[in-house]
């Protein structure tokens, strides 16, 4: 739609098509009915729920260490807006090139879900979190050392697969900590902290890009990803193993 020569018409048609496809997907959700949970906690006020948070974190140290590690690793997302800008400076971007790079990013993320899902079923989401973080680190480093057209396509495929595995595992692993009744609170805590970190990251990335260049953004993002992954590796045990140990059986 955009073609070799970028134009307002090409971009407009792209946005309209994206709007139509997104609307179709959202409308299809109207037919989905939420299943009835086996147990439901007694309804309490928001203030009462907030007062329970410190006790929840104290009683589940593994989860507490996890969401801190996740927040640190999420800071690594600061590089996401700058990958395409760096690629534009290094190889130049036409509509066709942008389409190919976006296609590699999207398709790698889509197909990798099958691989990440198989790994999660067999070994748990913790391993997916670690592997996807390391893949993200490798892809970012490759973009720095070999900014050619072919390598850029490969790098964006790696980033697409890594980001998809990271997002899926970082959210899904929360479901495996602790008891079922406090699961919504754990999800809220982990997502809130991660989104705060995800919001701060691009601001820091923008400042680094302005003062020191895009390379500094990627190096800093790699640092956060490595630190987050190391914290999970050394201080967050596999939740399934913890649950099996607490119940006296192996799942």
Indicate residue ranges for each PLM-predicted region.
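Helix-loop junctions at membrane interfaces in 12-TM secondary transporters
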Residues: 144-155
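Structural signature of the two symmetry-related core transmembrane helices
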Residues: 19, 127-142, 222
């Amino acid at each position: 739609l955009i073609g070799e020569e970028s134009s307002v018409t090409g971009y407009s048609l792209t946005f309209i098509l994206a709007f139509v496809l997104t609307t179709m997907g959202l409308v299809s959700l109207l037919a989905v009915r939420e299943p009835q949970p086996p147990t439901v906690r007694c309804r309490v006020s928001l203030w009462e729920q907030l007062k329970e948070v410190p006790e929840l974190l104290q009683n589940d140290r593994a989860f507490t260490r996890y969401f801190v590690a996740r927040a640190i690793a999420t800071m690594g997302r600061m590089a996401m807006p700058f990958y395409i800008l760096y690629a534009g400076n290094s190889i130049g971007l036409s509509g066709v090139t942008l389409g190919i790079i976006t296609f590699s990013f999207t398709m790698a993320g889509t197909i990798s879900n099958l691989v990440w899902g198989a790994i999660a079923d067999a070994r748990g989401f913790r391993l997916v979190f670690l592997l996807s973080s390391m893949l993200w680190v490798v892809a970012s480093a490759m973009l720095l050392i070999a900014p050619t057209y072919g390598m850029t396509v490969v790098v964006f495929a790696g980033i697409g697969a890594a980001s998809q595995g990271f997002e899926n595992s970082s959210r899904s692993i929360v479901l495996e900590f602790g008891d079922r009744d406090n699961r919504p609170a754990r999800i809220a805590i982990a997502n809130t902290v991660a989104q705060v970190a995800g919001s701060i990251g691009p601001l820091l990335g923008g400042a680094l890009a302005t003062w020191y260049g895009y390379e500094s953004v990627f190096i800093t993002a790699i640092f956060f990803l490595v630190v987050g992954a190391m914290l999970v590796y050394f201080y967050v045990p596999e939740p399934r193993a913890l649950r099996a140990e607490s119940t006296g059986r192996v799942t």
